[in-house]
From Swiss-Prot:
Subcellular compartments: Cytoplasm
Subunit text: Homodimer.
SUPFAM superfamilies per record: Triosephosphate isomerase (TIM) (SSF51351)
Pathway: Carbohydrate biosynthesis; gluconeogenesis; Carbohydrate degradation; glycolysis; D-glyceraldehyde 3-phosphate from glycerone phosphate: step 1/1
Active site residues according to the UniProt entry: H95 (electrophile), E167 (proton acceptor)
GO CC terms: cytosol
One term of GO molecular function: triose-phosphate isomerase activity
Catalytic activity: D-glyceraldehyde 3-phosphate = dihydroxyacetone phosphate
Source species of the chain: Flavobacterium johnsoniae (strain ATCC 17061 / DSM 2064 / JCM 8514 / BCRC 14874 / CCUG 350202 / NBRC 14942 / NCIMB 11054 / UW101) (Cytophaga johnsonae)
Protein name per the record: Triosephosphate isomerase
Sites where the protein binds substrate: N9, W10, K11, G173, S213, G234, G235
Amino acid sequence: MRKSIVAGNWKMHKNAAQTEELLNELIAKIPAKTNAQVIVAPTFVNLQAAAAKLKNTTIGVSAQNVHQAEGGAFTGEISADMLTSIGVNTVILGHSERRAIFHETDALIANKVDTALKHDMTVIFCFGEELKDRQSGNHFNIVENQLRDGVFHIAKESWSKIVLAYEPVWAIGTGETASPEQAQEMHEFIRETIRKAFGAEIADEVSILYGGSVKPENAKEIFSKPDVDGGLIGGAALKADDFLAIVTAI
């Protein structure tokens, strides 16, 4: 049975004091037993403190990015070894903002996936179409190509370390949200694409999260769809009560 997951991507928000405050709220408010695995992804500078604070809780911690190299002269970058050495064993890769703002290509993201898996990290792999792709009817092709280029090269045994996060880019930070029916349609397509490539066992086990402006008001309906296994949450993850409402919507 595949896992339900709610992951909060904090992006470039929360300084050290604010991070501690939000973590304290989440620890106090999120029940010890939930139907979903709960993960938060603070900024790099607050990861070590977050990992230490959450160590004996049921809340997991993730990095928002990692460099593809093992180490070396890469000013400003963070390696997988550095992350795992502080107890961070999950990483978000391929996020639409990394693709658009920092020009990360499918090939680069695939290299990052390989590096993370080499260090036994869980990868939350993000992918999804832009508005022009959906308007032109090309959204299924775009999603399939990003999947194939990003993760279809990995060995079957590595799929237990992969979580997929479908991001309709046109519904991120815009206030727009794919309808629950649109989300289910794409998630079903994604699962079927994986089934054709890797077989039913992997397709049925991989968790596919929805990552397009999930809020307390729409979470329950989106999460009720059979192929939606949770969410990658942005803005709503920055307020404890909003994030709690989304976590408990599963």
